[in-house]
Amino acid sequence: MATQSKYQSKQFDALSGDLIAILEKHKAPVDLSLMALGNMVTNILLENVQTEAQRLALAEAFSNALKNSLKIK
């Protein structure tokens, strides 16, 4: 999703691979996968970002990055 990252590709690829493997292990359909990932994002923001304004700004940035990643280039 991100065009630039402060994380190494190896670290990102390993984490992404693990998350995908879990969803595949549970044979989660698209809607269940999106629900679970959405809940994870919500929990990450609620547990790690102090103010509502910051959470909303990050959620908006995340949403925009997701939408941009779906555009055909």
From Swiss-Prot:
Coiled coil: none annotated. It comes from the Bacteria. InterPro entries: UPF0352 (IPR009857), YejL_sf (IPR023202). Gene3D superfamilies: YejL-like. Belongs to the UPF0352 family. This is UPF0352 protein APJL_0577.
